[in-house]
């Protein structure tokens, strides 16, 4: 993939009705790890049962396209894939970032009891560290919307160095002035703005 100029590989939050961590994909992940490329999890209608629920584009965006972010996060972070592949970097793109508070909170609630359960431990699919440690490890990135009112809280959760710039351009809900919106925000420091608009993309993808 490097010889053809790839700077990241892109997947959806699930592979059909299977999580990204499903054992049938182990050989694929082993081979991908050898490339050294970062992984981008992209918004999309990847989980077929959701299509039975939605009837409008709004429902599709919020449910069928949005909820696979949580499914992908559970697979990659909560089921130990970042432990099995210690050089893997992961970004969640076009999902926004509000969803992260819910899934991190739920995992923090359930994981302590699961770690005490020998039958769960025997499956070998629990993360070795606290979830918060992965968020600030330099290997996990999110892409909030430029006008996200929770951006300061998201920075507090993952660190400013893990926030990627997002505009959704040229989608219908995209923002053609997203960079200006970041620059004009009064709740970010100049250093945080530079990190979001430039430095963090280099951290994730490498220098252009």
Model-derived regions: residue spans:
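Active-site gating/metal-coordination segments in enzymes
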Residues: 1-79
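Histidine/acidic-residue-rich catalytic or RNA/ligand-binding cores of hydrolases
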Residues: 21, 49-56, 96-115, 151-158, ...
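A general structural motif
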Residues: 70-73, 119-125, 143-147
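Mid-to-C-terminal alpha-helical segments outside catalytic/metal-binding sites
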Residues: 79-80, 88, 99, 126, ...
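Proline-centered flexible-loop/turn and helix-kink motifs
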Residues: 27, 33, 86-87, 159
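Hydrophobic faces of well-ordered beta-strands that scaffold small-molecule active sites
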Residues: 9-11, 39-41, 90-92, 140-144, ...
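Active-site beta-loop-alpha junctions enriched in small/polar residues
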Residues: 13-16, 42-46, 95-98, 145-147, ...
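Aromatic-lined glycan-binding groove of carbohydrate-active enzymes
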Residues: 43, 78-82, 86-133, 137
């Amino acid at each position: 993939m490097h010889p053809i100029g790839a700077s990241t590989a892109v997947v959806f939050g699930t592979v059909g009705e299977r999580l990204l961590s499903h054992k049938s994909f182990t050989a694929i992940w082993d081979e991908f790890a050898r490339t050294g490329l970062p992984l981008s999890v992209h918004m999309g209608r990847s989980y077929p049962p959701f299509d039975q629920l939605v009837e409008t584009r709004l429902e599709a965006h919020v449910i069928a396209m949005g909820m696979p972010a949580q499914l992908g996060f559970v697979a990659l972070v909560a089921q130990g894939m970042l432990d099995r592949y210690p050089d893997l970097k992961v970004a969640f793109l076009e999902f926004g970032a509000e969803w992260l508070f819910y899934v991190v909170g739920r995992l923090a609630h359930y994981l302590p009891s699961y770690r005490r359960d020998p039958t769960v431990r025997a499956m070998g699919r629990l993360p070795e560290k606290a979830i918060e440690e992965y968020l600030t490890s330099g290997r996990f990135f999110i892409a909030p919307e430029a006008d996200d009112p929770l951006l300061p809280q998201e920075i507090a959760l993952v660190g400013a160095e893990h926030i990627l710039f997002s505009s959704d351009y040229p989608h219908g809900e995209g923002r053609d002035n997203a960079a200006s919106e970041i620059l004009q925000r009064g709740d970010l420091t100049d250093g945080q703005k530079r990190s979001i608009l430039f430095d963090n993309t280099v951290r994730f993808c490498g220098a252009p």
